UniProtKB/Swiss-Prot annotation:
Gene Ontology terms, MF aspect: metal ion binding; phospho-N-acetylmuramoyl-pentapeptide-transferase activity; UDP-N-acetylmuramoyl-L-alanyl-D-glutamyl-meso-2,6-diaminopimelyl-D-alanyl-D-alanine:undecaprenyl-phosphate transferase activity
Annotated Gene Ontology cellular component terms: plasma membrane
Catalytic activity, EC: 2.7.8.13
Organism, scientific name: Thermobifida fusca (strain YX)
Catalytic activity, reaction form: UDP-N-acetyl-alpha-D-muramoyl-L-alanyl-gamma-D-glutamyl-meso-2,6-diaminopimeloyl-D-alanyl-D-alanine + di-trans,octa-cis-undecaprenyl phosphate = di-trans,octa-cis-undecaprenyl diphospho-N-acetyl-alpha-D-muramoyl-L-alanyl-D-glutamyl-meso-2,6-diaminopimeloyl-D-alanyl-D-alanine + UMP
Protein name: Phospho-N-acetylmuramoyl-pentapeptide-transferase
Subcellular location(s) of the protein: Cell membrane
Keyword terms: Cell cycle, Cell division, Cell membrane, Cell shape, Cell wall biogenesis/degradation, Magnesium, Membrane, Metal-binding, Peptidoglycan synthesis, Transferase, Transmembrane, Transmembrane helix
Encoding gene, per UniProt annotation: mraY
């Protein structure tokens, strides 16, 4: 528990102290957000707001994670480091995307194929890595089984698992990216998801098969350290939300959204809760589904289901205030997280 508290506290402090000078530097070099012409007209006032604020989240999280290990005088684990590497790697892809947007003064950065290639390169390294490095109990950071609340079904071939993991990584990182359209929306939703993973990691530690071979135990390699990773990211996101709350003084950009999406899916794979992520990140799923429905409907029928996709912009065009949308969407995400935690606990109880 000391490591969890230390990670969150250090990350929060580092990110909070870093953000004001980062905002000033980004303003000075005119690293501001480019707004799409076809977006909601109210967003025109956000033109030039500093972006790439995800740098502070990433830096704070990394310092918080390794700082917590310094405080507790314990070495980082393979599972924790792999999730951090996925987090930083996808953040680098997002940074390139943001930098191109700023350099070329346009709302679109990396071409979709180039962004996908970057996600695949980082994702393949993570997916292969989690199938390696068994501990003395033969537990690896990840499992080639499918998982919902724990592993189930027969193991997949490693190559098939890599494809499955890539699908999860690309889908989740892009889902968080789509959600990052209103001040504070993606940050708040991610905070709620990270709280879930702090709880899951801590619970799996207490019910680990390493400590007691009981029917309801978990075969997760490094549950405590995964909770530390989640806590470090949680601290960074809370600090960022202070400056990202409406009206935002800084945006996380793709630097932050791709990184946080990668972190969430990395935690899902290593805690053996791959499919539960659909509930823990329920808001991200809803918003992504709205884009799929909108594009599919327009291509098939020539008609749009929503006034605009992603879903948050549909409600903007209906006249909802931005803060109203954000708070109501946070409530929806909170209900998803509560449902996921209930499922997680109820599955454990009967065993």
């Amino acid at each position: 528990m000391t490591g969890i508290i230390a990670a969150a506290g250090i990350s929060l402090l580092v990110s909070f102290l870093l953000l004001p000078p980062l905002i000033r530097i980004l303003y000075r070099f005119k690293f501001g957000q480019e707004i799409r012409d076809d977006g909601p007209q109210g967003h025109k006032t956000k033109q030039g707001t500093p972006t790439m604020g995800g740098i502070a989240i990433i830096f704070g999280t990394v310092v918080g994670y390794f700082g917590a290990h310094a405080v507790t005088m314990t070495p980082p684990t393979v599972s924790g480091v792999l999730v951090i590497l996925l987090f930083v790697g996808l953040g680098c892809v997002g940074f390139l995307d943001d930098f191109i947007k700023i350099y070329k003064r346009r709302s679109l950065g990396l071409r979709s194929g180039a962004k996908m290639l970057g996600q695949i390169i980082v994702g393949v390294g993570f997916a292969i890595g989690v199938t390696m490095f068994p501990n003395s109990y033969t537990y690896t950071p990840g499992s080639t089984h499918l998982s919902l609340l724990r592993d189930f079904g027969p193991p997949m071939a490693v190559w098939l698992f890599v494809i499955w993991a890539l699908l999860l990584i690309v889908a989740t990182s892009n889902a968080v990216n789509l959600t990052d359209g209103l001040d504070g929306l993606a940050t708040g939703a991610t905070i709620l998801s990270l709280v879930a993973y702090v709880i899951i990691g801590n619970w799996q530690l207490r019910q680990s098969c390493i400590n007691a071979l009981e029917p309801n135990c978990y075969t997760v390699r490094d549950p405590l350290d995964l909770a530390v990773v989640a806590a470090a990211a949680l601290g960074g996101c809370i600090a960022f939300l202070w400056f990202n709350a409406p009206p935002a003084k800084i945006f996380m950009g793709d630097t932050g959204s791709l990184a946080l999406g990668g972190l969430l899916v990395g935690l899902a794979i290593t805690t053996r809760t791959q499919l539960l992520l659909l509930v823990i990140g329920g808001l991200f799923v809803l918003i992504t589904a709205s884009v799929i429905i909108q594009v599919g409907s327009f291509r098939l029928t020539g008609k749009r289901v929503f006034r605009m996709a992603p879903l948050q912009h549909h409600f903007e065009l209906k006249g909802w205030a931005e803060t109203t949308i954000v708070i109501r969407f946070w409530i929806i995400q909170g209900l998803f997280v509560a449902a996921a935690m209930a499922l997680f606990y109820l599955e454990w109880m009967p065993r």
